[in-house]
């Protein structure tokens, strides 16, 4: 009671003050609102006045040419649709015509040429066209990586010889609403198969550096994994990606990335997914078949250099994964793997361009190291021997590549890479496999010519020693073209 | 106890009024130096400006590098040219920034080209025409009248984002507008002799400058926008100059000077390096210096026999 009384008095004293503060802050905010409204109108008025002056100045030249005098009238009458008329006007008249022409455009000059109507909200569409000529000294149908057990459907090595269509990629992207954007990449394979490479929605509004993606996407592990094939610097992905991540790891799930509030670039990411592809296997379980953690940091060194480096980890579960292998006798067998795989990836890239202007010359050096541990059990020779046993392997792979743009439109690149199957522990199946110890190696040289930002022709030569005792000399001639929306590429 | 909590809350509440305006300066991330300089003119000490590119870089071709992503992440306002100039890199920056405030359509996303009348708007955009921009020529900063228009819009945007300092922004804007009008009057008077002067451009980057000064572009060294000049096209331009002579050839500070120098030597005309944006030359230290220096260079070149 004693305490309540002074409290009540204090409350009674404070409340009106609070109320006063409220009204005065209300007034202040109202005033601010009015001020900003007034400012906005003033801005528009000033802009309109200036336009009017310019229009008047342009319409009344001392002695206008016939074309210049006629064109504005025609344009004003029929609106922006006639903009095509400008290029045909004589060069001398163009500067006079142009200002007047644009005056006819609406006051809010937002993308008037977007096409209006129902199509105005169409997503941006781009289509990548790509084709190959391949020449190899060994038959690609018999391509294998000695000492490695990989799933049957996995594409490793060159796909075919001679002329072939490469992947055709259709990309669609647009804002969903003020809070989300969506994108899809549909891949049309040369064998007429259609696959959904990526199809996701992504938040734009979480703020605080957070971004959430849901759907199918390429995992953010490593450097090359998230990049679409048309942005690769070589025709093919490194062997390490082919043998450890099934060329490129994509999954259905969720991806959360966060940029902490720092002046230094740090990006942290976490992913959960179905585990639908190698090194996982699609098993339809309720839980996550894949989890991944990524961390990247980057920055500039002066005006001419920039870098990014990172460490990622990907876990995937495999149930009844069929693997093609070669046994000690040199025969082809199919094994069955059950277990889990953990892939660690360290990646780094360094780019240089004089004063940060990559138009004329630039250089980039990148490298990644991938190490995978597969633990579980392996049933040897399905359908014949059917012998189960514990299995543990720690294969690894790496590549280093440099790409130098020595003059506008021309680049040359060199890549060297290697694989190490490690010393797998086959348990009771040990006697069925050869000792191994062979380390595949590959060196690749490429030169590409980019007539514009949207087209590229590339020649690639490679010496591939993925098979023990066999050297495959490969030649590729490739074109990659982009139609439609101007793509924006990540670093 | 609960009463006392209420009391403390009531007493503490007004403190929030002091706490809120005390936050750090408005962080402006400008895509090009001209908008960084303009934001600095209009915001003074109220803004903290960071510029993504320098005058020595081609604004069409910038990489969405980590240092830019982190600056976009921390920005309150992203001020860019728009009109697809930054289409190859800004969308990636914004996507990866995780910053809701600066996404397209938000008050924190400002595109200067939305507030000016654009030239070279293609009727039927097609890439056979080179790297054309469907929204029109994006190099709007070469006309000081455009700077004036953008200043009005950017000032309004700063007041909208930071209403607590609206009066200060308004004052800075009025001050800038006055100085700019005076400068424009001076430049216009200085540039009278440039009216009608025929010129060659290396890239179609100066249409707004020509529109302002009444200069006439008779040829372009790039066969198509964004395509590097070829030897055969340079020869064509050289021979076309016999029929329609030009007085000078212009290129931007970030460009390779060799095509312009080749033409200058072979056609016997002046070669002019245009600073193009703030920082593009010794003299172009700020927006005023940019136009002072641009005009000085053009006048020197046009005075040559």
Where on the chain are the PLM-derived regions?
Chain A
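A short secondary-structure junction signal
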Residues: 268-269, 279-284, 321-324, 379
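N-terminal periplasmic/intermembrane-space "pro-region" immediately following the signal or transit peptide
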Residues: 21-145, 150-153, 265, 483, ...
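Outer membrane beta-barrel
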Residues: 89, 110-278, 285-303, 313, ...
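Short helix-to-loop capping/linker segments positioned immediately adjacent to catalytic or ligand/cofactor-binding
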Residues: 279-283, 297, 334-335, 354-356
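Gram-negative bacterial Sec-dependent N-terminal signal peptides
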Residues: 2-20
């Amino acid at each position: 009671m004693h305490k309540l009384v002074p409290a009540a008095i204090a409350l009674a004293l404070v409340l009106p003050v609070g109320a006063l503060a409220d009204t005065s802050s209300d007034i202040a905010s109202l005033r601010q609102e009015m001020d900003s409204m007034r400012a906005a109108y003033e801005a528009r008025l000033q802009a309109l006045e200036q336009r009017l002056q310019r229009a008047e100045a342009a319409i009344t030249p001392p002695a206008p040419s016939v074309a210049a005098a006629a064109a504005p009238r025609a344009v004003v009458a029929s609106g922006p649709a006639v903009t095509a008329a400008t290029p045909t006007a004589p060069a001398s008249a163009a500067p006079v015509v142009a200002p007047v022409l644009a005056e006819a455009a609406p006051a809010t000059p937002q993308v008037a040429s977007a096409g209006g109507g129902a199509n105005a909200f169409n997503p941006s569409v781009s289509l990548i066209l790509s084709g190959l000529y391949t020449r190899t000294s060994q038959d690609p149908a018999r391509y294998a990586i000695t000492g490695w057990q990989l799933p049957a459907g996995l594409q490793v090595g060159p796909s075919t010889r001679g002329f072939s269509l490469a992947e055709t990629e259709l990309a669609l992207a647009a804002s969903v609403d003020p809070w989300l954007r969506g994108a899809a990449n549909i891949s049309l394979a040369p064998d007429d198969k259609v696959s959904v490479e990526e199809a996701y929605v992504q938040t734009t509004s979480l703020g605080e550096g957070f971004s959430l993606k849901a759907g199918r996407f390429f995992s953010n592990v490593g450097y090359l994994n998230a990049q679409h094939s048309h942005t690769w610097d070589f025709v093919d992905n490194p062997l390490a990606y082919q043998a450890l991540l099934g060329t490129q790891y994509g999954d259905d799930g969720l991806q959360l990335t966060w940029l902490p509030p720092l002046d230094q670039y740090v990006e942290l990411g976490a992913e959960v997914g179905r585990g639908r592809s190698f090194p996982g296997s699609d098993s339809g379980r309720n839980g996550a078949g894949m989890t991944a953690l990524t961390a990247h940091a980057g920055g500039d060194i002066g005006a001419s250099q920039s870098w990014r480096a990172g460490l990622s980890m990907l876990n995937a579960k495999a149930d009844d994964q069929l693997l093609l292998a070669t046994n000690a006798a040199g025969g082809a067998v199919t094994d069955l793997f059950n277990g889990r795989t953990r892939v660690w990836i360290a990646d780094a890239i360094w780019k240089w361009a004089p004063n940060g202007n990559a138009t004329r010359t630039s250089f980039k050096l990148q490298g990644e190291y991938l190490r995978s541990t597969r633990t579980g059990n392996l049933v040897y020779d399905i359908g014949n021997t059917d012998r189960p046993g514990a299995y543990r392997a720690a294969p690894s792979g790496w590549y280093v590549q440099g790409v130098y743009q020595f003059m506008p439109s021309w680049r040359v690149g060199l890549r060297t890479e290697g694989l190490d199957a490690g010393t797998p522990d086959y348990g009771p199946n040990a006697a069925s496999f050869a000792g191994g110890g062979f380390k595949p190696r590959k060196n690749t040289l490429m030169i590409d010519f980019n007539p514009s930002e949207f087209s590229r022709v590339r020649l690639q030569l490679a010496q591939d020693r993925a098979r023990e005792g066999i050297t495959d000399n490969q030649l590729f001639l490739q074109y990659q073209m982009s139609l439609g929306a101007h793509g924006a590429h990540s670093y | 106890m609960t009463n006392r909590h209420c009391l403390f809350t009531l007493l503490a509440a007004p403190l929030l009024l002091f706490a809120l305006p005390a936050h750090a300066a408005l962080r402006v991330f400008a895509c090009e130096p001209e908008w960084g300089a303009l934001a600095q003119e209009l915001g003074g000490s109220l803004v903290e400006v960071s510029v993504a590119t320098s005058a020595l870089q081609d604004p069409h071709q910038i990489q969405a590098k980590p240092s830019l992503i982190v600056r976009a992440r921390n920005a309150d306002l992203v001020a860019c040219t728009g009109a697809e100039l930054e289409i190859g890199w800004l969308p990636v920056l914004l996507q990866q920034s995780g910053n809701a405030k600066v996404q397209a359509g938000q008050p924190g996303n400002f595109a200067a080209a939305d507030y000016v009348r654009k030239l070279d708007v293609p009727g039927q955009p097609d890439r056979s025409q080179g790297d054309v921009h469907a929204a029109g020529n994006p190099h709007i900063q070469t006309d000081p009248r455009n700077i004036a228009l953008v200043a009005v819009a950017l000032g309004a945007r700063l007041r909208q984002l930071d209403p607590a300092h609206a009066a200060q922004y308004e004052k800075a804007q009025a001050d800038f507008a006055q100085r700019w009008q005076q400068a424009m009057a001076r430049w216009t008077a200085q540039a009278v002799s440039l009216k009608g002067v025929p010129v060659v451009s290396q890239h179609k980057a100066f249409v707004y400058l020509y529109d302002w000064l009444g200069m006439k572009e008779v040829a372009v060294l790039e066969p198509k926008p964004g395509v590097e000049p070829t030897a055969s096209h340079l020869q064509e331009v050289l021979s076309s100059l016999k029929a329609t002579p030009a007085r000078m050839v212009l290129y931007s500070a970030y460009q390779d000077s060799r095509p312009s120098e080749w033409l200058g030597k072979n056609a016997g005309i002046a070669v002019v390096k245009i600073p193009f944006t703030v920082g593009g030359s010794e003299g172009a230290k700020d927006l005023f210096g940019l136009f002072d220096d641009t005009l000085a260079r053009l006048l020197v070149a046009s005075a040559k026999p």
